[in-house]
Amino acid sequence: MALARRLCWCSAKIAGSSKPFASAPCSLPSRRNVCSSPSMRQSCMSAWAIGQYGTNEVLRYSEEIPVPTVSSPSDVMIKVHATSLNPLDVLMRGGYGAKLLKLRRDPLSVMDSGCEFPLVLGRDVSGEVVDCGSEVTHFAPGDEVWAAVPPWKQGSLAEYVTLTEYEVSHKPELLSHTEAASIPYVASTAVSALVNAGGLCRDTSSDKRVLITGGSGGVGTFSIQLLKAWGAHVTVTCSQNAEGLVRGLGADEVVDYTAGDVAEQLGTMEKFDLILDNIGGDTEQQAMGLLKPWAGAKYITLVTPLLLNTDSMGLLDGAVNAGFTLHTKAIQPPGPFVHGSIQLVSLARFSCSSHTLSGLLWTCHFPLGDHSAIEPSSVKLLVSTE
């Protein structure tokens, strides 16, 4: 069954500026030519980046961002043909996960204030390999690839991005770079949640009842199609104006959260085998009473307490508090589920997938260096470097 994905909802206003960044407080690593072609020998590139955390005003277009290096034998350097914006980019611009992500980038500089800047945003990339490490075996210069960029790495709103070969896949030939750039991050998140955490696949999803909260977003819309292709029964919560979208993607039942108490509406339905929560907050407590009382019932949330806790409490206290929170929820399910096993899975990492999709729709894309403002809209913004 061919899968089609409507683009995720991302409201963002980019205030274009070419004001240069202040010098970074930490030294840059030694550089080498990015590839053998003389035209590619450069030390700086164009990119959208931030020099501090804040609102839209901190996002700037610069032509003086250091070109990423191939510093590991397994590295692959990609010339970006297209990228896109995700809600995570907006959160990271404001400092979400800053402490833990800084630790992941460089444990030795975790106490150095501002060492992560300039920080390039962007989690999706579709482009062409221009350079490879000495041990790379699956890719060669000229290969067309796509990838989801981990949040602790420099992003793809730039001319180049460097990843390990294990984070990259060959781009499906039937997709253009613009189409391909709309998929990797939300698709990887959905697959990680449903397959790795939820244990679902083509052979295990038939007749399973799945609830997706916030189902009109990027992860939700991809999950709907994947689950329907596998034969699951899918219920979605969303606003009334998104009902047509999710039904068009295959949702069996839709609950309008603007039409009354969501828990009350869901309480009249048959209980669920799996709940994928894209919202968090009070949704968690509501969801626990909606699971079937059997050992395989699972509640999966994409709203991890780890990053929020480390931001507010510091690395050590935040990590301990998050671990205690997850442990308590996992071993003490409420109400009639005391005799069952309900798993609370908090996804803080995402693994790449190369599922082939077709029939993509997009409504807005613009060149990397376009400084014109993008007004808030219900689209996924696609950025082309071509």
Language-model segments: which ranges?
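Acidic, Ala/Val/Gly-enriched low-complexity intrinsically disordered segments
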Residues: A12-A15, A22, V34, V379, ...
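N-terminal chloroplast transit peptides
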Residues: M1-S27
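General secretory precursor processing signal
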Residues: S11-K13, P29, P38, P367
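N-terminal mitochondrial targeting presequences
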Residues: C26-M45
